[in-house]
């Protein structure tokens, strides 16, 4: 009132001009106030790069979680309902549940980074199908796979979108009254609502706790105990220097059934093997011959969840490295694996010929192509395990390429995986191949850049790097197929025990009529059967080049499978250059004449390399370890010897101890790190080391304890 009075009092004393000026000023001020009152609030600031990144990466945190999907528009939840029809029993999803209690609850199973399959309480998949429908799917696969996006909201929360991989369309909710899917429909395409009016693509995820877990192998270990350590202290634990995680891709990818992981889960990774092995394993010719010494061996091919006959220690053509089994081995004290990428062009071409399953879309038998694929698979496996455990870098399975990386990974409580190559035609340098220093160098650089750090210069057969350790029988047939010649032998030197060879074409050279034909065409080699023999070939000039380049690059030279002449020549180079990166990873060198370790073994120990016996039951394995430990006694190096499984390398695994029935490994047991481990369960099968030996890689934990 005082202000009004004052204005009026002053106004009475003003001239008309002054009065008009004041009036205009007051009117302008009033108009300004009206404009200020009608102006819209400033829009919120766009999210920062850090906020966008946090929302995007929050998708990783959904792994193995349980959530209800809620509409931000009306607060309703997705629920399953019967829409009728034949597809997926007429079941689909909509947004009509008024509470989380009545909503569908989805288990989020990662398939890769940012990609998930969602299964409800009954194991039905949030899925899509042709032509453009959402349904409660019954099967894993790309139509049940969604790329999930995380989106930052102004209140600091996140919303999530779902892009279907099978149809390449986004999941939507129609909360309005227009269109085929009006009033709560979940859809990907609505021709009656082409502009997607009153629909949304971003949803709230409300945490729940009563989902049905996705099928998976159990670890059966106490996961509460940390395996972290001080990176500056010595590493304690076990290493397996000879494994073949990716051997399911060698020999055309149609020999070893199963995968260590699958985006679609264990039901796909460890499915029935009849698709490549035929009914009752009738087409599993190499597996039956090598594992059971009987090409007519028959077995029940069923896999998950029953596993009536595989995995087993003699079942060489079935997957034993499922990723959860590998994780269990890590929990049991295994700190590092050398995963050898493997190929054998002869066996690959034989398999592609004799097994009809290999006639359709087999992998390339060329060694370099096969190795490339296996490197890709190991990287995919690392990413898959990361996705299961919370995103990039979070998984226990870590590819490493330096000692420092390996030590850091182990200190972080994870497993270090080092890549190597074991192939008879390394770098496409079989006897019949065109191979030069230039082609070798190009391939060497390529695999080094991919993370490979260990190589076998020779494997089963002679190649352009040198002579292989001689073997008769099936391997000698392979030598002939690979090189055009059988093993050409000579009397061994006085320090070396060789192998006995039988004259004639291996396996069939004594068969009447066939023998005469083979003699006629010169395919019945003649050997001195009175004494053990050695390969007459040693290290070639190209082999000298390769070994020196490996030393230049700090790579590990695998000595196994070398002829004694080749091995002696390599050790001369290694000793001259004072190099320690040499290893006999699975006891596949010739022994001394009296059966004791060869001078090559002693040379490896003296240089600071690694010696590892091939695995066997714990009672006999001790002798193999002691045999090599003695070679380190007079050296300055760590007195330690690992064992190698060579699982996946077409070699039988360790059986149970002969006294396991009366003196069994007791379950549960406590590891050196204080982790409690019980019998491993996968699906409906329980594995017990006492009964079946090393049936799969998860039992390495049990074997270490034994």
What are the functions of these language-model segments?
Residues 1-14:
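N-terminal secretory signal peptides that target proteins for export/translocation
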Residues 18-29:
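Bacterial N-terminal signal peptides
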Residues 31-36:
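Boundary at the C-terminal end of the N-terminal hydrophobic targeting segment
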Residues 37, 205-534, 540-548, 552, ...:
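N-terminal hydrophobic targeting/anchoring segments and the immediately downstream early-domain regions
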Residues 37-214:
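Lectin-like carbohydrate-binding module/patch detector with strong preference for beta-trefoil
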Residues 121, 562, 587-589, 614-616:
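Histidine- and/or cysteine-centered catalytic micro-motif in compact active-site loops
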Residues 556-562:
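Catalytic beta/alpha-barrel core
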């Amino acid at each position: 009132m005082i202000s009004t009075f004052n204005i009026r009092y002053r106004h009475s004393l003003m001239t008309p001009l002054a009065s008009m000026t004041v009036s205009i000023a007051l009117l302008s001020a009033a108009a300004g106030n009206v404009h200020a009152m009608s102006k819209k609030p400033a829009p919120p600031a766009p999210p920062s790069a850090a906020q966008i990144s946090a929302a995007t990466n929050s998708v990783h945190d959904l792994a193995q979680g349980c959530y209800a999907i809620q509409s931000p528009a009306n607060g309703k939840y997705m629920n399953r309902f019967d829409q009728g029809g034949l597809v997926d029993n007429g079941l689909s999803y909509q947004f009509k549940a008024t509470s989380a209690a009545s909503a569908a609850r989805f288990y989020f199973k990662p398939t890769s980074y940012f990609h998930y399959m969602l299964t409800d309480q009954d194991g039905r998949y949030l899925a899509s199908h042709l032509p453009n429908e959402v349904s409660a799917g019954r099967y894993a696969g790309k139509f049940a796979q969604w790329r999930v996006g995380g989106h930052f909201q102004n209140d600091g929360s996140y919303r999530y979108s779902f892009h279907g991989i099978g149809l390449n369309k986004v999941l939507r909710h129609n909360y309005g009254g227009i269109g085929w899917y009006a009033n709560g429909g979940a859809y990907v395409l609505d021709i009656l609502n082409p502009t997607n009016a009153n629909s949304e693509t971003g949803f709230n995820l409300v945490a729940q706790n009563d989902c049905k877990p996705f099928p998976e192998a159990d670890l059966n270990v106490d996961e509460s105990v940390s395996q972290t350590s001080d990176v500056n202290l010595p590493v304690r634990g076990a290493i397996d220097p000879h494994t073949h995680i990716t051997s399911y891709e060698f020999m055309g990818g149609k020999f070893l059934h199963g995968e260590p992981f699958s985006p679609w889960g264990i039901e796909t990774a460890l499915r029935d093997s009849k698709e490549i092995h035929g009914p009752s394993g009738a087409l599993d010719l190499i597996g039956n011959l090598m594992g059971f010494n009987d090409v007519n061996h028959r077995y029940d091919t069923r896999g998950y969840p029953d596993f009536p006959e595989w995995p087993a220690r003699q079942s060489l053509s079935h997957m034993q490295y499922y990723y959860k089994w590998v994780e269990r081995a890590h929990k049991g004290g295994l700190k590092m694996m050398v995963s050898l990428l493997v190929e054998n062009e002869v066996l690959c071409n034989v398999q592609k010929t004799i097994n009809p399953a290999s006639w359709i879309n087999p992998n390339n038998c060329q060694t370099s192509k096969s190795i490339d694929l296996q490197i890709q698979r190991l990287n995919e496996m690392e990413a898959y395990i990361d996705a299961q455990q919370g995103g990039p870098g979070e998984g226990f399975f870590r590819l490493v390429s330096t000692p420092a990386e390996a030590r850091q990974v182990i200190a972080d409580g994870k497993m270090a995986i080092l890549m190597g190559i074991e192939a008879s035609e390394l770098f496409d340098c079989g006897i019949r191949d065109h191979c030069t220093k230039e082609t070798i160098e190009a391939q060497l650089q390529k695999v080094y850049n991919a993370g490979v750090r260990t190589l076998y210069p020779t494997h089963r057969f002679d190649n352009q790097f040198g002579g292989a350790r001689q073997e008769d029988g099936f391997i000698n047939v392979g030598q002939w197929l690979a090189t055009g010649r059988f093993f050409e032998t000579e009397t061994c030197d006085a320090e070396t025990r060789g192998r006995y060879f039988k004259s004639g074409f291996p396996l069939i050279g004594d068969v009447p009529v066939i023998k005469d034909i083979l003699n006629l065409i010169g395919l019945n080699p003649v050997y001195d059967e009175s004494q053990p023999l050695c390969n007459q070939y040693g290290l070639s000039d190209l082999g000298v080049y390769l070994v020196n380049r490996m030393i230049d690059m700090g790579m590990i030279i695998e000595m196994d499978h070398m002829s004694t002449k080749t091995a002696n020549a390599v050790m001369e180079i290694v000793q001259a250059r004072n190099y320690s990166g040499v290893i006999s990873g699975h006891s596949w060198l010739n022994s001394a004449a009296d059966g004791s370790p060869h001078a090559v073994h002693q040379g490896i120990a003296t240089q600071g390399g690694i010696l590892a016996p091939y695995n066997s039951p714990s009672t006999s394995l001790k002798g193999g370890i002691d045999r090599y430990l003695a070679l380190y006694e007079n050296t300055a190096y760590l007195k330690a010897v690992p064992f190698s499984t060579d699982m996946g390398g077409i070699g039988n695994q360790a059986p149970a101890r002969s006294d396991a029935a009366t003196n069994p490994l007791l379950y549960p047991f406590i590891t050196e790190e204080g982790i409690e481990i019980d019998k491993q369960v996968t699906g409906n099968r329980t594995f017990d080391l006492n009964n079946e030996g090393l049936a799969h890689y998860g039992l390495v934990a049990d074997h270490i304890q034994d």
